[in-house]
Amino acid sequence: MHPFASYVLRSYYRGTGWNEDNLYANLTRSSNAILDFSVPRGLHFSISKSPNPLFKTTYSMNALPSLNGSIGYIFTSCELDVKGSGDVRFKDMVDRFRVYDQPRRPEGKEEEWLAGERVDTRDYLLYGRVYIPTGRLDALYSTRLSPTLQAMVAAISDPRSSLFAESPRGIAAPSSNIMFSLQHDTGKWCTEYTWSAEDGMWGVRCLHNFGKVGGPSEPVEDSEKSTAAPTKTRSGVKRIDEEDAMEGGLKGRISAGAEFYFSAKEKSAGVSTGIRFTTLPDATPPSFQLPSSSPTQPSLLAHGAPSQPPTTITALFNPMLGHMSGAYSARVSRDLSMSSRFDFNVYSYESEWSIGAEWWTRRGRGMFTSNPPAADTSEKTPSSPPALEAVGDVTGVVKARASTTTDFSLMWEGRLHNMLVSLGIVSNLTSRSKPIKAIGLELSYFSSG
């Protein structure tokens, strides 16, 4: 489950029109949501408040296995409607499998003029969190320099680092660091430059999207919501997001990228490359409200399935470490998504196969019913298509993963009344002495106004 600060940051990106998904670092986000989800450890509480649309506060406490906590503050230049934990869209609070819409060039902020002078300022976000009792301080500053350029500064200050530095044993110490990041997104290309002060590391990441780039329009949430309004009906005419038909196979787009980093201080370097294929977001009901007179609407609703299964296929390769990874993820039904990944090292011949799934639970089951029969008329009219009842609200998600080398993990995330709950367990089925390695419960509540 996303911490409140992460949820606010994502809301800030969405509110300012920045596409955080068009980054090389997020190339495998869809499969990671199923195969690399984080299970809570111990007992964790979190309470947050938004007294106004610009300022937020958050408090958290870990009761087990040790007692500690933190206090955080967030300020944004633009108003954000973050709602409350009781009415926020649940899928916005968890990492999940998604098929993202085609990338678009970010749009700039509308200009504001007063007495012949431009008075609008660039958007920014300020975040700070202090941990108790360690005194560690985390800070983040993000600002939009231009419609396609964003800068970020992240810093960590830990007073314990100076104490460990004086230790004669040279024990590994929590370090303080500051990192600068500059992101340039044009839709088709996205480049990120980073520099870390602690180890003097320079890095560059680049992602290229092949095919068409979406025009300026409203940002898209995911494939379950509409991606672009259809310009024509289903009677054999293409939608906006459709491309030329292909014989068989999946229809989608390809993205490829790479990263390179170098540290003169540590005398080390690294490089990796990756490629991703993702299907086009489907625009069938209930995402789009097709005309009721469409002759194909009844058959589409009766099946209730997209024209092609939402699918994401990724491959990564690190030549210096010899690591190769391939993942396949797909939504096999409305509420069930599955993923599989195979990792292999060409130097050590070590391999790992991981599988996982996420299943969404709902309050009620949506079903298709016909309209009530109308009174007899002298003139025959075509029968009305079946009506789609509202699909039940999402109440939670169950995630499970297993692999050939790691433990089996199971987690449930949901909403109880006005509180978000996350309950998970990690077990080692091969160990008779300690089959359960960890169990955790996380409770989160936040409100606005």
UniProtKB/Swiss-Prot annotation:
Protein name from the UniProt record: Mitochondrial distribution and morphology protein 10
Membrane topology annotation: Multi-pass membrane protein
UniProt free text on domains: Lacks alpha-helical transmembrane segments, suggesting that it resides in the membrane via beta-sheet conformations similar to those predicted for other outer membrane proteins and porin.
Region of interest (Disordered), residue spans: 215-244, 282-307
Biased composition (Low complexity): 285-301
A Gene Ontology term for the protein's cellular component: ERMES complex
GO BP: establishment of mitochondrion localization; mitochondrial genome maintenance; mitochondrial outer membrane translocase complex assembly; mitochondrion-endoplasmic reticulum membrane tethering; phospholipid transport; protein insertion into mitochondrial outer membrane
Subcellular location(s) per record: Mitochondrion outer membrane
Gene of this entry: MDM10
Superkingdom of this protein's organism: Eukaryota
Entry keyword annotation includes Mitochondrion: yes
Location, primary (coarse class): mitochondrion
Protein's organism: Postia placenta (strain ATCC 44394 / Madison 698-R)
Signal sequence interval, chain numbering: none
Keyword entries, A-Z: Membrane, Mitochondrion, Mitochondrion outer membrane, Transmembrane, Transmembrane beta strand
Function: Component of the ERMES/MDM complex, which serves as a molecular tether to connect the endoplasmic reticulum and mitochondria. Components of this complex are involved in the control of mitochondrial shape and protein biogenesis and may function in phospholipid exchange. MDM10 is involved in the late assembly steps of the general translocase of the mitochondrial outer membrane (TOM complex). Functions in the TOM40-specific route of the assembly of outer membrane beta-barrel proteins, including the association of TOM40 with the receptor TOM22 and small TOM proteins.
Family label: Belongs to the MDM10 family.
InterPro entries: Mdm10
Subunit structure: Component of the ER-mitochondria encounter structure (ERMES) or MDM complex, composed of MMM1, MDM10, MDM12 and MDM34. Associates with the mitochondrial outer membrane sorting assembly machinery SAM(core) complex.
